[in-house]
């Protein structure tokens, strides 16, 4: 792949990450994603267009507001960098344009959902529901256009992963919330459109990461009653499946044969 599409993917990823930073702060607060324009979280001063360039502006301002000098949280540039990196990685990993268009913003969304779940212990419907609609539209159109997406497998993945976590949530409501169930359904739908083996890998890795996180929390003295957000582990499993899901599934099947 030439450098030009990679550069385009990076720019789009940074821009998407910048939008996700707005969502991270505004969605949990019930604020509009469009108005008012971006502002300093400390003094509320509107951020100039020149100071709103992803990553670069934060570095130029040394992580501080131009108006009041207050520290701007590093979650802004880190989210933008993560999104930009994921967009580039997806562009390099997937030659099929329909798959890339579906997976790149999905991976960036996983970053935002993880941050929100860690901070607020919930996964907002304002992000999940639009993601369902947009992803479903891309999958259906991509399937009809002969792209590398399968709408039927997407539906199977949605039901399988979503229903699986719903059963767990009903059995152990304190350990799993309905936000996690909806996120699992979204992951199952998106990854299922690529291959059902990716859904299996995402589920397995999500469980492994969640178990490791629970062990770390116990060792850190948080105790069994402390709420541990499961969304980041589901999101992490999904991202792992995007990039190495097929090799992991193949390796597992080889062990069984």
Enumerate the predicted regions with their spans:
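Functional transmembrane core segments of multi-pass inner-membrane proteins
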Residues: 112-211, 215-218, 250-257
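Alpha-helical transmembrane segments of multipass membrane proteins
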Residues: 16-21, 83, 87, 138, ...
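Interfacial loop-to-transmembrane junctions
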Residues: 215-241, 252
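N-terminal transmembrane signal-anchor/hairpin module of polytopic inner-membrane proteins
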Residues: 1-97, 254-255
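Intramembrane alpha-helical segments
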Residues: 69-145
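Hydrophobic alpha-helical transmembrane segments
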Residues: 6-11, 77-81, 89, 100-104, ...
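Transmembrane helix interruption/hinge and helix-loop junction motifs
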Residues: 93-99, 192-201, 244-246
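Helix-loop junctions at the membrane-solvent interface of multi-pass transporters
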Residues: 27, 90-94, 141, 145, ...
């Amino acid at each position: 792949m030439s450098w030009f599409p990679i550069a385009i993917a990076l720019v789009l990823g940074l821009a998407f990450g910048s939008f996700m930073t707005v969502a991270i702060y505004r969605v949990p607060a019930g604020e509009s994603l469009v108005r008012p324009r971006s502002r300093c979280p400390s003094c509320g001063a509107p951020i100039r267009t020149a100071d709103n360039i992803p990553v670069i502006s934060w570095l130029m301002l040394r992580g501080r507001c131009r108006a009041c000098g207050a520290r701007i949280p590093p979650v802004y540039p880190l989210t933008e960098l993560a999104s930009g990196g994921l967009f580039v990685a997806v562009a390099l990993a997937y030659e099929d344009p329909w798959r890339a268009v579906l997976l790149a913003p999905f991976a960036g969304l996983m970053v935002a959902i993880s941050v929100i779940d860690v901070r607020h212990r919930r996964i907002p419907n304002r992000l999940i529901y639009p993601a369902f609609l947009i992803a479903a539209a891309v999958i259906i159109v991509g399937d009809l256009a002969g792209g590398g997406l399968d709408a039927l497998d997407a539906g199977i993945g949605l039901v399988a992963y979503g229903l699986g976590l719903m059963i767990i949530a009903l059995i152990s409501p304190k350990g799993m919330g309905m936000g996690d169930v909806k996120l699992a359904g979204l992951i199952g739908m998106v990854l299922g459109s690529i291959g059902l083996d990716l859904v299996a890998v995402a589920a397995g890795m999500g469980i492994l990461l969640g178990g490791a996180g629970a062990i770390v929390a116990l060792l850190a003295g948080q105790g069994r009653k402390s709420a541990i957000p499961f969304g980041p582990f589901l999101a992490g499993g999904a991202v792992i499946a995007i990039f190495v899901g097929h090799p992991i599934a193949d390796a597992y099947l080889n062990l069984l044969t």
